[in-house]
A protein has these predicted regions:
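A structural signal for short, well-ordered beta-strand segments and their strand-loop junctions
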Residues: 4, 53-55, 102-105, 110, ...
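Catalytic core and acceptor-binding pocket of nucleotide-sugar-dependent glycosyltransferases
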Residues: 147-267, 273-276
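N-terminal anchoring/stem segment of glycosyltransferases
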Residues: 1-80, 93-98
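GT-A fold catalytic core of metal-dependent nucleotide-sugar glycosyltransferases
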Residues: 73-76, 80-135, 141-145, 149-150
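A generic structural signal for well-ordered coil/turn residues at beta-strand boundaries
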Residues: 135-136, 239
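Residue-level signal for well-ordered alpha-helical scaffold segments within enzymatic catalytic domains
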Residues: 45, 90, 181-182
């Protein structure tokens, strides 16, 4: 069974948040509750035997969300700090969830059955890499929680805390730049300056701190990035499992959801006609 575990918590701004959080929530007013609703619907559309578990704080209750929650008290933490903390505790504590895990945000849509991301593949953790040769953790995939996997995530949390003052944009990018730092150090891919510039990641499998880490393409079939060019006409590709709506792509989230929902319903009707007596 696939466990999709998106993180989301309401921003209260009693703690200083990243400028991007202020921009998305207060200025652009992106509707993360509605994103979650669409993500949930598309997940169960293709994965009826799977389970979606919202990772959040003790007080967030998204509108129209009736599923289960994994809650941690992160009232003293920013949203990115909370995300990293929840991901760490989810993997490292005994929560009864120990295999076929996809951790993500809410601004995503599912496009097909997700179990093939795990089947007949030898890895512990999958991490997406952008074409600019940096980590984008739109999704982090864990095949099975082992002791080494737990130690990897504990170390990642330690580095997230210890490196917090090394980057002025850590309050927004720190969750994924921590992965970058660990990978660069372990694979001896050290950039000349911080924050990390381009460096030669090669997709494939690597041994990192006792774990088999598989680097996959951000924008590829497993972790797709919705493409708004050319002329905003592109739809979903049938062989792409998961679509991320990064940055300005969020403006196309709901129209894409409606378009793909209609396509799905038309396809179902065609299939029903073919099998009808």
């Amino acid at each position: 069974m696939v466990h999709l575990i998106p993180f989301y918590k309401d921003a209260n701004f009693k703690i200083k948040e990243a400028p991007e959080i202020i921009d998305f929530v207060k200025k652009k007013r992106y509707d993360y509750h509605k994103y979650l609703e669409c993500l949930t619907e598309t997940f169960y559309r293709y994965n009826p035997e799977g389970k979606l578990l919202l990772s959040t704080d003790m007080t967030t209750n998204p509108v129209n969300y009736q599923g289960e929650c994994y809650r941690q008290d992160t009232s003293d933490k920013t949203i990115i700090q909370s995300k990293v903390y929840n991901e760490t505790r989810l993997i490292c504590d005994d929560n009864g969830i120990d295999e076929n895990i996809i951790m993500c945000g809410t601004d995503h849509l599912i496009n097909r059955k997700l179990d093939k991301i795990f089947l007949n593949q030898d890895f512990d953790i999958k991490i997406p890499i952008r074409k600019t040769a940096r980590v984008n953790n739109a999704m982090i995939v864990v095949k099975k929680v082992t002791d080494n996997v737990k130690r990897f995530f504990e170390y990642r949390y330690e580095r997230f805390i210890s490196d917090e003052d090394s980057d002025p944009h850590w309050d927004w990018y720190g969750d994924q730049r921590t992965y970058d730092k660990i990978l660069r150090e372990e694979l001896n891919l050290l950039p000349v300056r911080e924050p990390p510039q381009k460096f030669p990641y090669q997709l494939g499998s690597y041994e990192v701190r006792g774990c088999k880490i598989k680097l996959i393409e951000y924008g590829g079939n497993e972790c797709g990035s919705f493409d708004i060019w050319p002329n905003h006409r592109r739809g979903f590709e049938d062989n792409t499992y998961f679509y991320d709506f990064k940055g300005k792509r969020k403006e196309y989230f709901f129209s894409s959801y409606e378009k793909e929902r209609r396509n799905y319903e038309r396809q179902r009707k065609k299939e029903d006609i073919r099998v009808s007596p």
